[in-house]
């Protein structure tokens, strides 16, 4: 099969940059179209780190022109903005991987936590892009909703125990994320002086990723107590999960059996860390049980498994390729 022409809408941010870096090295995807809402810049002007490696003009989005050049498009744009692109792209016959929240949730839940949904027809047909659960559906999908970063780390840690029905709500998820998770746009919250040598929770118990965790685990929103924290590192995410369990079972064995065929989940006998997954699509998971309390630790790269490399894995499956094709698997260490 010849290379597949793909495009990226939303090239300005960190997830757009990570997508471009992966696609430039991908043996079967040819990056043919790079756009954002304004256009008028070169890629190296937006991302100086790419200077000398790859150059192109970043154009203003033109759906007709995009449809002539590409078979698949990645949307690395904010929620609500994605809805404006998905409908015409699908109508033009393109496949879409959407990295926003626009197609992850049911209409009612989405509108409760985000805004009115203007593309319910495609929402009903979107496939949640978690290959460990939905690989076969992703292969047939025209539209894949890439999971959020926090939900990815929480859901992958909890799934095996919810599946075996040994775990009971409430679920407590305490997550730490690097500053890149807040995006590229400047703010007082992510200002160096505020972040450096500091640690703080934000939007505790009401963060918009909590209903995504709940919906995909099949529990009520009120049963998931999720608190994210910003830590002074560039990239990475570590979720500490606490849940009550019952019955006589080996937690490590349940985890290992559930993920025995998973290509991007590594079950660890030792506590996991962010550094060991930086720059990769891996999710590393550790579990420890004390009496009726189960502790689960889950580590991902928020920009990779939590966004861009996960999106390329989904695109691989949609186009009939092996999910590992072109996906970085060696961490940024040291």
Swiss-Prot record:
Q: In which pathway does it act?
A: Amino-acid biosynthesis; L-arginine biosynthesis; N(2)-acetyl-L-ornithine from L-glutamate: step 3/4
The record's EC number reads: 1.2.1.38
Give the Pfam families listed for this entry.
Semialdhyde_dh, Semialdhyde_dhC_1
- Output the Gene Ontology terms for molecular function: N-acetyl-gamma-glutamyl-phosphate reductase activity; NAD binding; NADP+ binding
Question: Which terms are listed as keywords in the entry?
Answer: Amino-acid biosynthesis, Arginine biosynthesis, Cytoplasm, NADP, Oxidoreductase
Query: Which SUPFAM superfamilies is this protein grouped with?
Result: Glyceraldehyde-3-phosphate dehydrogenase-like, C-terminal domain, NAD(P)-binding Rossmann-fold domains
> InterPro entries this protein is in?
AGPR_AS, AGPR_type-1, NAD(P)-bd_dom_sf, NAGSA_dehydrogenase, Semialdehyde_DH_NAD-bd
Q: Which PANTHER family match?
A: N-ACETYL-GAMMA-GLUTAMYL-PHOSPHATE REDUCTASE, CHLOROPLASTIC-RELATED, N-ACETYL-GAMMA-GLUTAMYL-PHOSPHATE REDUCTASE, CHLOROPLASTIC-RELATED-RELATED
Q: Which HAMAP family match?
A: ArgC_type1 (MF_00150)
Protein name (record): N-acetyl-gamma-glutamyl-phosphate reductase
Q: Which gene encodes it?
A: argC
């Amino acid at each position: 099969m010849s290379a597949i022409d793909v495009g990226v809408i939303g090239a300005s941010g960190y997830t757009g940059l990570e997508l471009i870096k992966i696609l430039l090295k991908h043996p079967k995807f040819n990056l043919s179209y790079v756009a954002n809402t304004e256009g008028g810049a070169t890629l190296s002007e937006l991302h100086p780190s790419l200077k000398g490696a790859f150059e192109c003009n970043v154009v203003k989005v033109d759906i007709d022109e995009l449809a002539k050049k590409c078979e698949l498009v990645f949307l690395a744009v904010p929620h609500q903005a994605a809805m404006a692109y998905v409908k015409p792209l699908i109508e033009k016959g393109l496949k879409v991987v959407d990295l926003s929240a626009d197609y992850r949730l049911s209409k009612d839940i989405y509108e409760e936590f985000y805004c009115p949904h203007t593309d319910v027809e495609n929402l009903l047909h979107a496939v949640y892009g978690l290959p460990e659960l939905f690989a076969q559906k992703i292969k047939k999908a025209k539209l894949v909703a890439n999971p959020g970063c926090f939900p990815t780390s929480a859901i992958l840690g909890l799934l095996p125990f919810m599946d075996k029905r040994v775990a009971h709500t409430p679920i407590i998820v305490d997550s730490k994320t690097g500053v890149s998770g807040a995006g590229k746009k400047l703010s007082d919250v992510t200002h160096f002086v505020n972040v450096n040598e500091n640690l703080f929770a934000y939007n505790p118990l009401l963060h918009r990723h909590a209903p995504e965790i709940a919906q995909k685990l099949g529990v009520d929103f009120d049963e998931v107590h999720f608190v994210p924290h910003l830590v002074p590192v560039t990239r990475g995410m570590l979720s500490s999960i606490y849940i009550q369990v019952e019955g006589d079972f080996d937690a490590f064995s349940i985890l290992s059996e559930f993920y025995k065929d998973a290509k991007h989940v590594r079950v660890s006998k030792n506590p996991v860390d962010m550094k060991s997954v930086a720059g990769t699509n891996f999710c590393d998971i550790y579990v420890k049980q004390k009496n009726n309390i189960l502790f689960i630790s889950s580590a991902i790269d928020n920009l990779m498994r939590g966004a861009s490399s996960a999106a390329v894995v989904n695109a691989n499956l949609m186009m009939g390729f092996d999910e590992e094709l072109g996906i970085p698997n060696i961490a940024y260490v040291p």
